[in-house]
């Protein structure tokens, strides 16, 4: 990494810990800053805070005392999840204390070029696909960002010959100023996180910050299926490379079941390692990045054909007696499950769905349920999900949890069938998060395989 003097002997407050805050604290300390970390979690429940204290970093836990800002900090590094209307953040802005993001801090010291990926859906899968293809092509791609590897930690190990492949959320992008990736991908834009941003327009503006400092020597990859992309493309200085599953574009596109870049055929959609129309979009974005990075067509095709998905995101788990299991626990809304269902033959599919009841009906899902072999329904939303199944004329059974649902599905399945966990609901009625829910599906698969 670059050793810069910008933060030498500067008093810096890190607001909010988690993985990114811990990494930022260590990086800034290494750069000679005088760091104070403030986290709302009590100290005795905060192993990360305890570890930082042992390293000599000042830590204040249990609350966010506004008076802490009376200490004349010269910078604040804010955790992405803390909104800008937080009293501490508002006070810092009133005092004209510059607020940095952790990803921008990483950018300042990075020797490696950055490929940034954002969007409403498909970020993690596309980020992982891109890194896999670049590495298969002999390059050194390092995953970082919102994918679980804090950018300010990864950047300390990265050298000029590496490439940081960085997943970026709207929370991380909303406050950047200097951040400039060489290649940026926006997978799609849907109205999400409006409780944080306030409006779809503000959410889009946050995502659009990924390209704010890009020039014509940089590349911006946009989803041409969306009308908003054409509008946004007119306002960037970057060179735009579109991708589309609906029309031929001057970039990556789907035509007659084949994925192309420009006029070069790369791979058949049926040969992709993960199913679903959304994964064709993810693969097209990946192809665009790979071609811009000089990866050979045969390597791109081979890598995409062997890509098995990301854990809990339409993850191909394996087979038992020629029955295939997919873990899509990350599908916490109707749209995500619709996209998952698009990749399967409903007549051979058993769907496990249901979860937290948010009061919404599932009428929009009904057309996607038509012809399903069977549903296994669970969770608080079971009654609403049953109504959708009845409208689609799909038979169903009820289960008490994911383990029981998976066992029931396996008993019903026949050779050649697929069992898909794609709940279309959040997990919090039964599980602390979608990862725990998905892990129960994986554990049950392992038990069933052991008994087979």
From Swiss-Prot:
- Which pathway does the protein contribute to? Cell wall biogenesis; peptidoglycan biosynthesis
Picking any one GO molecular function of the record gives:
UDP-N-acetylmuramoylalanine-D-glutamate ligase activity
Would I find Nucleotide-binding among this entry's keywords? Answer: yes
Q: Which reaction does it catalyse?
A: UDP-N-acetyl-alpha-D-muramoyl-L-alanine + D-glutamate + ATP = UDP-N-acetyl-alpha-D-muramoyl-L-alanyl-D-glutamate + ADP + phosphate + H(+)
Could you give one GO CC term from the UniProt record?
cytoplasm
Q: Which residues form a coiled coil?
A: none
The record's section on SUPFAM superfamilies has: MurCD N-terminal domain, MurD-like peptide ligases, catalytic domain, MurD-like peptide ligases, peptide-binding domain
Q: Which InterPro entries match?
A: Mur-like_cat_sf (IPR036565), Mur_ligase_C (IPR004101), Mur_ligase_C_dom_sf (IPR036615), Mur_ligase_cen (IPR013221), MurD (IPR005762)
GO process terms (BP): cell division; cell wall organization; peptidoglycan biosynthetic process; regulation of cell shape
Keywords annotated in UniProt = ATP-binding, Cell cycle, Cell division, Cell shape, Cell wall biogenesis/degradation, Cytoplasm, Ligase, Nucleotide-binding, Peptidoglycan synthesis
Which residues bind ATP per the record? 119-125
Is the keyword Ligase in the record? yes
Q: What is its EC number?
A: 6.3.2.9
Q: Which Gene3D superfamilies match?
A: Mur ligase, C-terminal domain, Mur-like, catalytic domain, NAD(P)-binding Rossmann-like Domain
Subcellular compartments: Cytoplasm
Positions of transmembrane segments: none
Enzyme's top EC category = ligase
- What is the superkingdom listed in this entry's lineage? Bacteria
**Pfam families (UniProt xref):** Mur_ligase_C, Mur_ligase_M, MurD-like_N
State what this protein does: Cell wall formation. Catalyzes the addition of glutamate to the nucleotide precursor UDP-N-acetylmuramoyl-L-alanine (UMA).
Family the UniProt entry places it in: Belongs to the MurCDEF family.
Q: Which NCBIfam families does this entry report, sorted A to Z? A: murD
Q: What is this protein called?
A: UDP-N-acetylmuramoylalanine--D-glutamate ligase
């Amino acid at each position: 990494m670059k050793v810069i003097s910008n933060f030498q002997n500067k008093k810096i407050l890190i607001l909010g810990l988690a993985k990114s805050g811990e990494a930022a604290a260590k990086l800034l300390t290494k750069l000679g800053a005088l760091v104070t970390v403030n986290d709302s979690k009590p100290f005795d429940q905060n192993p990360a805070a305890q570890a930082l204290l042992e390293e000599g970093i000042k830590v204040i836990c249990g609350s966010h005392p506004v008076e802490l800002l009376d200490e004349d900090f010269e910078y604040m590094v804010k955790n992405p999840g803390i909104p800008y209307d937080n009293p501490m953040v508002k006070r810092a802005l009133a005092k004209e204390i510059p607020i940095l993001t952790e990803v921008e801090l990483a950018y300042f010291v990075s020797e490696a070029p950055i490929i940034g990926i954002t969007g409403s859906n498909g970020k993690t899968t596309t980020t992982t696909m891109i890194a896999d293809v670049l590495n298969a092509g002999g390059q050194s791609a390092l995953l970082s960002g919102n994918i679980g590897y804090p950018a300010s930690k990864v950047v300390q190990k990265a050298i000029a010959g590496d490439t940081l492949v960085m997943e970026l959320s709207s929370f991380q992008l909303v406050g950047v100023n200097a951040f400039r990736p060489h290649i940026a991908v926006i997978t799609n834009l849907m109205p999400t996180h409006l409780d944080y941003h306030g409006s779809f327009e503000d959410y889009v503006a946050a995502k659009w910050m990924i390209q704010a400092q890009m020039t014509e020597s940089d590349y911006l990859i946009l989803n041409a299926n969306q009308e908003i992309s054409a509008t946004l493309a007119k306002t960037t200085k970057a060179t735009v490379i579109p991708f589309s599953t609906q029309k031929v574009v001057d970039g990556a596109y789907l035509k007659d079941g084949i994925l192309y870049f420009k006029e070069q055929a790369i791979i058949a959609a049926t040969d992709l390692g993960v199913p679903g129309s959304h994964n064709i979009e993810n693969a097209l974005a990946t192809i665009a990045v790979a071609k811009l990075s000089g990866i050979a067509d045969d390597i791109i095709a081979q890598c995409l054909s062997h890509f098995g998905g990301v854990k809990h995101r339409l993850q191909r788990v394996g087979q038992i007696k020629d029955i295939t299991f997919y873990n899509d626990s990350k599908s916490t809304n109707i749209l995500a499950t619709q996209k998952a269902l698009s990749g399967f033959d409903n007549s051979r599919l058993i769907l496990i769905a249901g979860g937290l009841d948010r009061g919404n009906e599932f009428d929009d899902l009904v057309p996607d349920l038509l012809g399903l072999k069977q549903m296994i329904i669970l969770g608080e939303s079971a009654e609403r999900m049953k109504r959708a199944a009845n409208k689609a004329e799909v038979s169903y059974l009820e289960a008490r949890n994911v383990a029981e649902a998976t066992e029931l599905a396996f008993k019903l399945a026949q050779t050649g069938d697929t069992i898909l966990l794609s709940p279309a609901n959040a997990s919090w009625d039964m599980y602390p998060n979608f990862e725990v829910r998905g892990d129960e599906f994986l554990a049950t698969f392992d038990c069933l395989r052991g008994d087979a």
